Design a protein with these regions (language model features):
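Terminal-proximal interaction/regulatory segments of ATP-powered molecular machines
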Residues: 312-412
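Long, charge-rich low-complexity segments
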Residues: 61-85, 89, 308-337
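Conserved ASCE/P-loop NTPase catalytic core
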Residues: 22-205
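Phosphate-sensing "switch" segment of ASCE/P-loop ATPases
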Residues: 139-144, 152, 158-320, 324, ...
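Charged, amphipathic alpha-helical linker segments immediately N-terminal to NTP-binding catalytic cores
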Residues: 1-28
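Short, hydrophobic-biased segments on the C-terminal half of alpha helices
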Residues: 62, 263, 354-358
Length: 412
């Protein structure tokens, strides 16, 4: 590339390959979601079994940005609340805060996260050992908060923190046997020095430069306080057509927030394509970036299935458990279900199975027989998991174009 030449806009496939060069096995949807969501800002919950690579995936996604070593502040799981305020300078310099396993932090995280969740700085008086006096320390809210939760830890349950859960994009790490085999094979390749990156050094530098530009562009859409107004917003003229297609199933109230999450991720994809997207002014003077049907399509491919399952109140191991019960129309104990899942290649504990069944029982997906021992089977409502949206992308494009023509001057 000659001096002054603008680097080619990388495809999302290239971004994914660069993230996997960290190196990382599998986790394609999570890596792309993290890389696209980090510049957009907000709250991300990343749950999954212990030792399933959540921190590694965060580091892998952040490696797609320039100077990524200084992008993410990983909160030590052993840090006390007071100790974090002594780190305020370092925390305030890094736009992404990655909170490790919350269950191991006792209540360290609650005061800070409650402040940051409301868009407020978190303040505390601490003793400055160099001055020998009490001073105020402030941790500013970061652009993006990532909260990790180990689903096999009995000390924490995401459902107990509804306010945090309702504001977040929620990802789940892959704890399957197949993923473990892929990770071990990659580890062996690295140890044997046979692993080779997919992206060359020059192209990797170009991709990181572009991705860092996404972060910089995001500043005009971001606010640090609830009282602030951003310099620009997004306009998604395809939103109504997508809503009409019932991409998000409306069976449960959760669909309301999942619909908003999906639209936010569509904005994140548009932000990624900022170099190719129109920034314009509406009649009321508002500056907007237009979210295109292409952005919506990418968002559906990367994130749509997660939103569909979330709207159906199916998360974690629910799909595996419910699919098994539908295939075997009888009733089974927790231990029997666990053994069948393990034989099918899923790494699950009896606690995973029990929590999944209890969650689905409250939503009507399974029937509990109070025998001795208790047994479970799929209910007629389990057929909801076959839900398919009625989206017609040609119709989405046509309606989006009509909306744009009706709201923008002809010269634009």
């Amino acid at each position: 590339m000659s001096d002054g030449e603008t680097p080619a806009v990388p495809s999302l496939y290239e971004v994914l390959q660069l993230a996997k060069d960290y190196p990382t096995a599998g986790e394609e949807h999570n890596l792309l979601t993290l890389a696209l969501a980090m510049p957009m800002g907000g709250l991300i919950i990343f749950d999954g079994p212990s030792s399933s690579g959540k921190t590694h995936s965060v580091n892998s996604a952040s490696s797609t940005f320039t100077n990524h070593e200084n992008l993410v502040y990983t909160v030590p799981t052993t840090a006390s609340e007071t100790a974090l305020y002594y780190e305020f300078d370092k925390m305030n310099q890094r736009p992404v805060h990655n909170w490790g396993d919350l269950a191991s932090m006792e209540k360290t995280w609650e005061p800070i996260l409650k402040d940051h969740g409301d868009g407020r700085p978190s303040n505390r008086k601490v003793t400055d050992v160099t001055l020998g006096e009490v001073v105020d320390k402030t941790i500013d809210p970061p652009a993006t908060l990532i909260l990790q939760i180990a689903t096999d830890n009995e000390d924490i349950n995401l459902n107990d923190y509804a306010e945090i859960k309702n504001r977040a994009l929620i990802l789940t790490s892959d704890g399957s046997r197949e993923q473990t085999e892929a990770v071990m094979a990659l580890q062996a390749a690295v140890e044997a020095r046979t692993f080779e990156p997919s992206v060359g050094e020059e192209r990797a530098a170009q991709i990181r430069e572009y991705m860092t530009g996404v972060f910089e562009t995001a500043e005009i859409f971001r606010t640090r306080r609830e009282s602030e107004k951003p310099m620009a917003t997004f306009w998604n003229p395809a939103a109504e057509a997508i809503a009409e297609a019932e991409v998000i199933p409306p069976m449960f109230n959760e669909a309301r927030r999942d619909n908003q999450r999906l639209f936010k991720f569509m904005r994140a994809v548009a932000l990624y394509h900022h170099a190719e997207r129109l920034m314009t002014f509406l009649e009321d003077g508002e500056r907007v970036m237009i979210v295109t049907p292409v952005d919506c399509w990418y968002a559906m491919v990367i994130f749509g299935e997660k939103m569909l399952r979330s709207a159906l109140n199916l998360r974690g191991h629910d799909i595996e458990v419910l699919s098994l019960l539908r295939e075997k129309p009888s009733s089974y104990t927790v231990a029997e279900i666990q053994q069948m899942l393990i034989q099918g290649g899923h790494n699950v504990t009896d606690r995973d199975v029990r929590r999944s069944l209890e969650n689905m029982f409250t939503k009507g997906y399974v029937i509990r027989h109070d025998d001795s021992p208790i047994t479970w089977q799929a209910s007629p409502m389990a057929s909801y998991m076959d839900y398919k949206s009625k989206i017609d992308w040609e119709d989405v494009v046509e309606k989006a174009a009509e909306t744009v023509r009706a709201n923008l001057p002809a010269e634009q």
